[in-house]
Curated annotation (Swiss-Prot):
Bilayer-spanning residue ranges: 23-43
Gene: psbK
Keyword Iron on entry: no
Compartment(s) of residence: Plastid, Chloroplast thylakoid membrane
GO annotation terms (biological process): photosynthesis
Name of the protein in its database record: Photosystem II reaction center protein K
Function: One of the components of the core complex of photosystem II (PSII). PSII is a light-driven water:plastoquinone oxidoreductase that uses light energy to abstract electrons from H(2)O, generating O(2) and a proton gradient subsequently used for ATP formation. It consists of a core antenna complex that captures photons, and an electron transfer chain that converts photonic excitation into a charge separation.
Record's keyword annotation contains Membrane: yes
Alphabetical keyword list: Chloroplast, Membrane, Photosynthesis, Photosystem II, Plastid, Reaction center, Thylakoid, Transmembrane, Transmembrane helix
One Pfam family here: PsbK
Cited SUPFAM superfamilies: Photosystem II reaction center protein K, PsbK
Amino acid sequence: METLLLSRLPEAYVVFSPIVDVLPIIPVFFLLLAFVWQAAIGFR
């Protein structure tokens, strides 16, 4: 049962590969968003 589950995992991950490719960019996006937000408050 476990070997069958492990053999099917790569097929399941193929569907999520675009999401996994985007995931490392999300923290950078939030960092830039926080920087722009602080800059906007500082300029006001």
